[in-house]
Amino acid sequence: MAILAGIIAYAASTFLVTGPARPGWLDSWFYIALELGAATVVTARVVLRPIERTAWGSIAGALYAVSLSDAAGAAAAATDRPAADVLDMLAFAFDAAFFGLAFAGLVLLVRKRLPPSTASVWLDGVIASLGMLSIASALFYRAADAITVASLLFLVYAVAPLVLVAILVGTAAALGRRPSEIWVLCTSAFSLMAVGNLIQATGLPWAVQPGSPVDTLWPLAALLLVAAAWRSRSTPRPVGSGSSVVLAIPSVFTLGALAVALVNQFTSLSYFSIGTAVVTVMAGALRLLFAVRDADRLRVRQVELNVSLGLARDAA
């Protein structure tokens, strides 16, 4: 409750206390304290509950990495060069650690929720993941005519949360059923992180200045991960009933990737958007071949069943 109250207070301050009158500690140490608080609550869950301990421990480590990255960034802003450059590199290293730990945690969570499946089911997840990355990157990323270190860092910063969302979207497609409450909470959390990064990546003055409403998204996302961690109480099993909307996800993202390729004929998109669109369409074509194969196998089985029923009727 204390973390929730702190997040509400911080969110209100982004509207009520702006400009030169805004104290610097609100956007540095108070903000970092909110992130550390969320990470600590997830860590407490890891200590107290053995279920999925490694997975949630990785996610707790990811939240700590975000806090340390922001702390290094705040220290860099108050330090002169060359120490500031070292702190900036340290902040980037912690950002990379966040992605690695969050990725590992999600993979561990997803692996226990996906039963042994056919190649078609896994391909549905790949199509949904790559298609979402292609569409989102086409909407938000600038074209990269020349690949530089700065453009690569920009791409990593903007893409990392999207990759985490893509894993969860792909999981929903692979399950082929209505996702669980844990999935909804995790997807909402990483989606908020992705939206925050995408808005800040636009470079709009109101979005990049300290204390903007966008800054509230990351602590709120951390709070959703806290809720997901503590709601996970038993051995995970795929739950829910079949959902035609979820089953249609691969087709929707394949069409979206085709749209990205079409838009590229009229305007220059990033290499990342084009590449993921091409791979998505190729995976969609392969999925169509699998569907034709499965339909043919079903037809053969139906014929064999009819023959068997006819023989049984004649024998009777």
Residue spans for each PLM region:
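Polytopic alpha-helical membrane-helix bundles and their juxtamembrane interface segments
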Residues: 1-316
